[in-house]
Regions:
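Hydrophobic, membrane-inserted alpha-helices
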Residues: 31-33, 53-59, 115-119, 144, ...
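C-terminal membrane-associated helical module and adjoining short loops/tails
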Residues: 1-29, 151, 161-317
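Basic, amphipathic juxtamembrane/active-site segments
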Residues: 75, 88-131, 135
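Alpha-helical transmembrane segments
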Residues: 131-166
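Helix-coil boundary and interhelical linker segments in multi-pass alpha-helical membrane proteins
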Residues: 59-72, 119-144, 277-286
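Juxtamembrane membrane-interface segments at transmembrane alpha-helix termini
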Residues: 63-65, 83-90, 154-158, 299-309
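Select subsegments of transmembrane alpha-helices in polytopic membrane proteins
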Residues: 44-49, 105-113, 258-267
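Membrane-embedded alpha-helical segments that form the functional core of polytopic membrane enzymes
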Residues: 44-100, 117, 141-150
């Protein structure tokens, strides 16, 4: 029988892409929940749905300005995140993976933050802008739109894309969820019209993949050349020495960028949100999203594209 430590390690995607806080806090708690729910026969999708309601509940609490409502919001969002970790760990450990699960998993975090942004705007719109006698009013809604749609969403999607790229070169196709828009569009086109749910998913997922590809032209050029020499299904340990060297060099160059992908996902946002809500200055969170995380995003993107340009030259030579 596997020990808890062995099961925890098996539930990780890779040590390179797991954040310190997740490894030592979120994932162990998530695994305890996963084992508990699995023993009761609860499906991972139910846990994902629970996380959505917990995230919406957290948003409701963040609407209020008093300390205890905000403490409750912190606790609810932490439990939503534990559930989000739990469903993925359960799916990986038990093999209970479904299309509905993929939809819910991608949907849940978006629902949390959509609700949170609305709650923060409703909370602040009648408050005064610090140092002035002017209410935030529509200004806070404009900040939330910029933070959520133009910053948060593209940052998180590109960070996820870079993680999946890293996992592909580290563990091969089987250890990654690196998809491309053409394949997803082909799946959509192949589905009969009565399978409307699957068609809706693959149509939107193809668009999501396309948005990632448009922002990474140098990676697309490098990856196209890489697949010419490696083949679509090459796996680590079952490839030529030349391909193995390219794979190893890419992983070596990509590994330092994983800290940026981690900073652009949940934990850094959540910690900033917790602190600013508890201190009753959640507008700082929106500025953190727009200014600090955008700088990290631009830096990460620039370095990754430079890495891909270097790797492309290595392939050509």
């Amino acid at each position: 029988m596997s020990t808890f430590k062995e099961m925890l390690q098996a539930s990780f995607k890779s040590n390179d892409t797991e954040e310190w806080l997740d490894v030592h806090f979120t994932r162990p708690i998530g695994l305890v929940f996963a084992l508990f729910w699995n023993k009761l026969g609860v499906h991972p999708n139910v846990i994902t749905i629970l996380s959505i309601f917990l995230g919406i509940g957290a948003a409701y609490m963040f609407y209020y300005t008093d300390l205890w409502h905000n403490v409750a919001g912190v606790v609810l969002l932490m439990f939503a995140n534990f559930c989000d970790s739990t469903d993925g760990q359960m799916a990986r450990l038990t093999g209970k993976k479904t299309l509905v699960g993929r939809v819910l998993d991608g949907f849940s975090g978006d629902v949390w933050f959509f609700a949170i942004y609305i709650a923060l705007c409703l909370r602040m719109m009648y408050q005064y802008i610090p140092g002035t006698a002017v209410h935030w009013g529509l200004i806070i809604w404009a900040l939330a739109v910029v933070a959520g749609i133009f910053c948060h969403s593209p940052q998180a999607s590109l960070a996820d894309y870079y993680r999946q790229i890293h996992l592909f070169f580290l563990k091969g196709k089987a250890g990654s969820e690196l998809d491309n828009s053409d394949q997803q569009r082909a799946i959509y086109d192949s589905l009969p019209k009565h399978k409307w749910f699957a068609r809706l998913f693959y149509f939107n997922y193809a668009k999501y993949c396309k948005s990632q590809e448009k922002r990474t032209p140098r990676f697309q050029a490098f990856f196209k050349e890489y697949l010419k020499i490696s083949g679509e299904d090459a796996e680590p340990g079952n490839e030529s020495l030349a391909v193995s060297k390219v794979r190893a060099d890419f992983v070596e160059g990509s590994r330092p960028l994983m800290k940026y992908t981690n900073l652009l996902t949940f934990n850094s946002r959540a910690i900033c949100l917790y602190i600013t809500c508890l201190l009753n200055c959640p507008w700082v969170y929106l500025l953190f999203e727009i200014l600090v995380l955008t700088v990290l995003y631009v830096h990460m993107h620039s370095r990754h594209e430079h890495l891909c340009e270097t790797m492309l030259e290595e392939l050509k030579n």
